[in-house]
Amino acid sequence: MNKDINIAAIIKNEIENFEGKIQNHDIGKVIIVGDGVALVSGIEKVKFGELVEFENNVLGIALNLEQDLIGVVIMASENSVFQGSIVRRTKSVISITVGDQLLGRVVNALGIPIDGKAELDNSLKSAIFTNAPSIMDRKSVDRGLKTGILAIDSLVPIGKGQRELIIGDRQTGKTTIAIDAILNQKGKDVYCVYVAIGQKNSSVAQIVSLLEKKGALEYTTVILAGASELSPLQYLAPYSGAAIAEYWMNKKKDVLIIYDDLSKHAIAYRTLSLLLRRPPGREAFPGDIFYQHSYLLERSAQLSNDKGGGSITALPIIETQAGDISAYIPTNVISITDGQIFLRDSLFNSGQKPAIDIGLSVSRVGSAAQTNLMKWASSSLKLNLAQYNELKAFAQFGSDLGPSSQLILDRGNKIYEILKQENQYPLTERQQIMLLILIRENLIDSLEQKSIPLFKSAFLKYCDSEPKFRDKIEKMDYNRVLEPNNLAGILKDITDFIEKFNLGNVF
């Protein structure tokens, strides 16, 4: 009897203390699924870019919001989602793990490690889609980001916070320039993010191996959305990279981000848009493709001192077809960025590496990103090359040239030899200035064109190894133009070296 009373009392107590918690879930149902896209009905309050969850824990992103249907891109194999599947709102936007733990790591577009190393701590996350800094949160670009490539640092200088497009046909050295820029940031307190979109996994593996070998992976994060990945992941990859870079920028750091390449990103977005039944426009791209790229690239900025002074420098890459820079995507990105480095395949095939077309390449930041000494040393370079290219085109008609015209042609050929540079061998600013002084003061006129590569190698060794000459170079103030007395002393040493070289006394 006592047992019955105790049981009844326990039940009564449980009923009295019961607190019914009602959980509301916005759910819908998959109407159509195919090609990585699901059309869902029943979820009315979902937001653009919000994560939704299917029955088997597969996630999707709501990218199309219509009156009765929602277009969701599936972040997994489409075979895992079926018609009639239940879909639930998560009420959260897609985010990615950020922080210093990502340095030296290779992750996919969702921030999941794919390098076989330790798992990441997911406690620190940032939304992939965020607004770019406002005008009042920025300041003008006035600090240079050195690539170590003489032709770029002297003719099309890049500043911290700038967006400089690298554009050209396939196999013209676009990725090589970007990777060399990463290698040159070693010891400069610049974090790097390399975003590979639609690239072959084997090519990215070689890049990761090179970065590791050169000691650059320790300050670099690689995000891979390879050619075999789903279109949604290729679409998300650059925004994920921007979110990772923004975390460091807001921590007062300088960041360099490479988007390799935005042509494949545009194709991935076109694929998604057509599957979502959006109306196609020029070249079948959706109407908002310009917005997608401008929204991405505007997130690169030089923050004001009040916001910490951090920066993101973006080097987007665009692949052209047969050198056509007037196509839709190239013209879009050219108009968004602060200049472009145009690579021409004819120059590349003739042995001019990097194959930069000086006439079509420009930096809209310009000399604001250079030190005063570099401005002075490179001031006559573009004029010399412009005169050379003009005369070269004229000389093709077989016209007889006078001595002064022939001198300009010979000098131009020698300048291009000086500008040739092997990849993975960046030059310091001091080395670049010494080579530019050779050009500025016309000291290369006494050299034969075929001997320039050997001379350049010997001269750079001389600059580093000759104690007295090295002391003069090290005393140069980058913020000031060379004093006449100092310049005269340096020119005398260089002239003596050239005389020895021409006599065969330098090896």
From Swiss-Prot:
Keywords: ATP synthesis, ATP-binding, Cell membrane, CF(1), Hydrogen ion transport, Ion transport, Membrane, Nucleotide-binding, Translocase, Transport. Its EC number is 7.1.2.2. It comes from the Bacteria. The keyword Disulfide bond does not apply. It is an enzyme of class 7 (translocase). It catalyses: ATP + H2O + 4 H(+)(in) = ADP + phosphate + 5 H(+)(out). It is found in: Cell membrane. GO terms for cellular component: plasma membrane; proton-transporting ATP synthase complex. The record marks S361 as: Required for activity. ATP binds at G168, D169, R170, Q171, T172, G173, K174, T175. It holds the Pfam family ATP-synt_ab. It is a peripheral membrane protein. InterPro entries: ATP_synth_asu-like_sf (IPR023366), ATP_synth_asu_C (IPR000793), ATP_synth_asu_C_sf (IPR038376), ATP_synth_F1_a_nt-bd_dom (IPR033732), ATP_synth_F1_asu (IPR005294), ATPase_a/bsu_AS (IPR020003), ATPase_F1/V1/A1_a/bsu_N (IPR004100), ATPase_F1/V1/A1_a/bsu_N_sf (IPR036121). One of its GO terms (molecular function) is ADP binding. Its main location: membrane. HAMAP family: ATP_synth_alpha_bact. F-type ATPases have 2 components, CF(1) - the catalytic core - and CF(0) - the membrane proton channel. CF(1) has five subunits: alpha(3), beta(3), gamma(1), delta(1), epsilon(1). CF(0) has three main subunits: a(1), b(2) and c(9-12). The alpha and beta chains form an alternating ring which encloses part of the gamma chain. CF(1) is attached to CF(0) by a central stalk formed by the gamma and epsilon chains, while a peripheral stalk is formed by the delta and b chains. Belongs to the ATPase alpha/beta chains family. Produces ATP from ADP in the presence of a proton gradient across the membrane. The alpha chain is a regulatory subunit. This is ATP synthase subunit alpha. It comes from Mesomycoplasma hyopneumoniae (strain J / ATCC 25934 / NCTC 10110) (Mycoplasma hyopneumoniae). The gene is atpA.
